[in-house]
């Protein structure tokens, strides 16, 4: 059984995405692409906060409440949190981070990495 992802996996995967930097803000690690935030490791680093369109976010939380949740202060923003110990494996974490990266990345990076963060063809 694969080990569940932890904060170090979040950091390693996020920083492997193109043009990503880590910056401490609000006393926590944040990850940015071309200066735009796409992931944070809040509180005890047991969950990761990522960009997610509100409609999609609400569906995720309803479908998998043990995995996804919305922090009160983020409710009005298009962000969702994923509990690291509820993720299936590192692959799922990679998909979540890459999807958030796509939402923040500028067009030049999306054009340079057209498949990054998109579902792979089966």
How should each PLM-predicted stretch be described?
Residues 1-122:
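Charge-dense, helix-prone N-terminal extensions
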């Amino acid at each position: 059984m694969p080990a569940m992802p932890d904060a170090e996996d979040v950091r390693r995967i996020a920083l492997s995405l193109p043009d990503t930097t880590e910056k401490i803000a609000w006393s926590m690690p944040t990850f940015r692409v071309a200066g735009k935030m796409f992931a944070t490791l809040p509180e005890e680093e047991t969950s990761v906060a990522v960009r997610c369109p509100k409609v999609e976010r609400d569906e995720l939380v309803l479908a998998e409440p043990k995995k996804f949740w919305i922090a009160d202060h983020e409710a009005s923003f298009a962000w969702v949190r994923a509990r690291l110990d509820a993720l299936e494996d590192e692959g799922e974490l990679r998909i979540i981070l890459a999807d958030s990266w796509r939402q923040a990345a500028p067009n030049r990076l999306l054009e340079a990495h057209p498949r990054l963060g998109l579902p792979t063809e089966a």
